[in-house]
UniProtKB/Swiss-Prot annotation:
It is an enzyme of class 4 (lyase). Substrate binds at residues 19, 41, 69-78, 124, 185, 194, 214-215. The gene is pyrF. Pfam families: OMPdecase. It comes from the Bacteria. The keyword Lyase applies. Keywords: Decarboxylase, Lyase, Pyrimidine biosynthesis. Belongs to the OMP decarboxylase family. Type 1 subfamily. Pathway: Pyrimidine metabolism; UMP biosynthesis via de novo pathway; UMP from orotate: step 2/2. This is Orotidine 5'-phosphate decarboxylase. Its EC number is 4.1.1.23. One of its GO terms (biological process) is 'de novo' UMP biosynthetic process. It catalyses: orotidine 5'-phosphate + H(+) = UMP + CO2. Homodimer.
Length: 243
């Protein structure tokens, strides 16, 4: 059975994508951003450095939340074993591939910690032509909602999906299902590899629990100020009785 979304304070609803090649660069970013960011996503680039869990441990010691974004996809037994081990670490979110019901169920059953599992639906870098090339001639929103419902039925706690689909997902799954949205572009589309993007306010108005932001902060002249500005947008978009 899916668990309720994490009880996130407003400042924890911004997740910074820590896409860097190693430990030293990661910690430099954490120090640079200071109190403007309290939640970090660590993914495949750091894993390849061999310093992944050193970074995870360093973030936890700084009282930061951690999102492990490794998109696990394998036979059910292998994914279950991985989730069982990872649940022993101080991890708030972890991604699993959202296209295999048996694997999703095995992952959910193996998750005995406080970690929330998020199913990957359709990457925000993909549009309908990309799906068609895979033999799926449907609109991304239809595929995403279908995958979200399948993940919920398997006991997964939420999904990671474009903010463009946050509203349809929320209406389909109800309030007790986590929605985390990457591909957020505070200033609008910028012509990078993200196709299905939205702004900060729209994501939260449509039902997102948290957003993932990378390049708009990382490439800003003052990254901490950029993160703080996004935090202000989040607070303005949340209900008045929100955290």
């Amino acid at each position: 059975m899916s668990r309720a979304p994490l009880p996130l304070a407003a400042h924890e609803r911004l997740i910074f994508a820590l896409d860097v090649p190693g430990h030293d660069e990661a910690i430099a970013w954490v120090d640079r951003l200071g109190d403007s960011v309290s939640f970090y996503k660590i993914g495949m680039e750091l894993l390849a450095s061999g310093e992944y869990f050193h970074v995870l441990d360093a973030l936890a010691k700084r009282d930061k939340r951690v999102f492990v974004d490794l998109k696990f996809f394998d036979i059910p037994a292998t994914v279950a074993g991985t989730i069982r081990r990872l649940a022993q670490w101080p991890v708030s979110y972890c991604t699993v591939h959202g296209w295999h019901a048996g694997m999703l169920q095995a992952a959910a059953e193996a998750n005995h910690g406080d970690m929330r599992l998020l199913a990957v639906t359709v990457l925000t870098s993909m549009g309908r032509p990309d799906l068609a090339a895979m033999g799926i001639d449907r609109e991304p929103v239809d595929v995403v909602v279908e995958r979200a419902l399948a993940a919920q039925a398997a006991g997964i706690d939420g999904v990671i999906a474009s903010g463009q689909e946050a509203g349809p997902i929320r209406r389909a799954t109800g309030p007790d299902f986590s929605i985390v949205c990457p591909g957020i572009r505070p200033g609008g589309p910028v012509g990078d590899d993200q196709q299905r993007t939205v702004g900060v306010a729209q994501a939260f108005t449509d039902g997102a629990d948290a957003i993932v932001v990378g390049r708009p902060i990382r490439q800003a002249s003052d990254p901490a100020a950029a993160a703080t500005a996004i935090q202000d947008e989040i607070r303005a978009a949340l209900p008045q009785n929100g955290n």
